[in-house]
Amino acid sequence: MQLHLCFWRFFLVIQFQITIYIYIINIYIIVIIATNAPVLPHQLKRVAKRPALALGRLGAISNPGSGDIFVAFSTGNRGATDEDRFNSIEQFPNNALESVFRATVQATEEAIVNAMVAAETMIGADGLRVHALPRDQVRDLFSH
């Protein structure tokens, strides 16, 4: 799921992309958040907490030992670790992080729904049959 946003605040135009990769394994979910927004490590820690909000919006509850993993990284400051010279880095304004948080939640929610709808009926170990979600019923649920 890729989301392109343009955020306006105090006449400051900030454009960034967020790409969400979802891996659902049994009852566990792994969410990888990739962005080109120039966010620093302490800001990425805050961004990496946001997929839990998307899970909650979809009705999931956290269990002890649920094993959900959320990881975030940014490509916004490429070359910042060049050891041959001094470098300047950009930092996404803290008062504008809400747009990154909102994009992360929305993109995660949509990626989860897309993953659920894309699943197909399958037969697993010991003949256990798991049915795909009926796409038309899922569409109806989200249209209301």
Q: Could you describe each region identified by the protein language model?
A:
Residues 1, 6, 12-17, 24-144:
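A structural signal for small-residue-enriched, beta-sheet-centric alpha/beta enzyme cores
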